[in-house]
Regions:
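N-terminal targeting signals for export/organelle localization
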Residues: 1-48, 176
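Conserved Rossmann-like nucleotide-binding pocket used by diverse enzymes
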Residues: 43, 73, 98
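A short beta-strand-turn-helix
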Residues: 45-69
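Hydrophobic beta-strand anchors of alpha/beta hydrolase catalytic cores
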Residues: 69-70, 97, 143
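Aromatic-flanked redox-active Cys/Sec active sites in thiol-based oxidoreductases
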Residues: 71-77
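Thiol/disulfide oxidoreductase modules built on the thioredoxin-like
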Residues: 114-119, 126-176
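Structural microenvironment flanking redox-active thiols in thiol-disulfide oxidoreductases
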Residues: 81-117, 127-133
Length: 176
């Protein structure tokens, strides 16, 4: 018995699998992995000052009742350099910003601040990336909105750009 329609079954299976593959590639995905610390208190830490003339940073510095940003950066990070003017704009808008410098030397942090400005109230040095990992940070730069009680309210992954400034101001103001 001749069954020519059986030849179409493998073709239909291949077409179906190909269609699924194309759909999977065409649908945009959220490829950012957010911290499991969202909605939780900052982990305990006390970091030494990242450079002379700028105070050190601990988790208790961020429990004074004032919401703020916590920026994770590095002097060697190109996107960190690109976001520097927008951090200055946030500071000019009255947003308090603390920072953690990742795997950096004091002289490199000082040179970074001299070239790009210092929007930070305090900068802790996390040379081992221990605090960065406790925060659930996956890279630099990253910025967190911290409530006045030390709760992590929001995480911005990647560099801050002009379009992010109003949103971050709004999130800090909403935390007041």
């Amino acid at each position: 018995m001749n069954r020519p329609w059986l030849l179409w079954i493998p073709l239909a299976v291949v077409a179906f699998i190909g269609g699924l593959a194309i759909y999977g590639l065409a649908v945009p995905k959220d490829d950012q992995v957010h911290s499991a610390m969202m909605g939780k208190k900052l982990p305990e830490f006390a970091l030494p000052a990242a450079t002379a003339g700028v105070p050190a940073l601990s988790n208790t510095d961020m429990t004074d009742g004032k919401p703020r940003l916590l920026n994770i950066f590095a002097s060697w990070c190109l996107p960190c350099k690109a976001e520097a003017p927008y951090l200055e704009a946030l500071k000019a808008a009255g947003v308090e910003i603390d920072a953690i410098a990742i795997r950096d030397k004091p002289e490199d942090v000082a040179a970074f601040l001299a070239e790009f400005g210092n929007p930070f109230r305090r900068i802790g040095s996390d040379s081992e990336m221990a605090v960065q990992l406790k925060l659930g940070s996956s890279g630099v730069p990253e910025t967190y909105v911290i409530g006045g009680d030390g709760t992590i309210l929001f995480q911005h992954i990647g560099d801050i750009r002009a379009e992010h400034v109003p949103m971050l101001i709004e999130k800090v103001n909403a935390a007041k």
